[in-house]
Amino acid sequence: MESPIFHMIIEQTKAYPMRMVYHPDSGEFTASEHGSLAHARNFTKPYGWIKESGTPPKPHWDCILMTDRDYELGDEVEIKVIGVFKRADFDHKYIVAETVRDIDDYAELSPAEKEELCRLYPRVGDGEGWFGMEEAYHCMKNHKKAL
């Protein structure tokens, strides 16, 4: 299956110990009073949202970019969806990669990348878990946060 191309907006990077908040009226990011979960768990990958899904604080799809590149807040990255961390509350976290990366599914991530993802979300409840591209597209199409 050819992966559709989407765009990710970078909202959080390893450089920020506090959770960043996007202000759509100004297009700016500011630090909140809350610590970043990613920073606390030594997670190095950028976090953000899929632009085509909406813009925070309105409904949108969160995503994690599996990359070794450094990005800045607000950067727009051309991506493909390769997997999903399904959550019981339907606030799924899509796993994405740059379109130039030769990878199409969560199963193709390295053991180190999978370990880092598990460090971000170490507790997996009933109905939750890490899944590949096929399940990610099922979630995008069928769950309550679907477009």
Where are these regions (language model features)?
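Hydrophobic N-terminal alpha-helices or hydrophobic patches in metabolic proteins across all domains
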Residues: 1-147
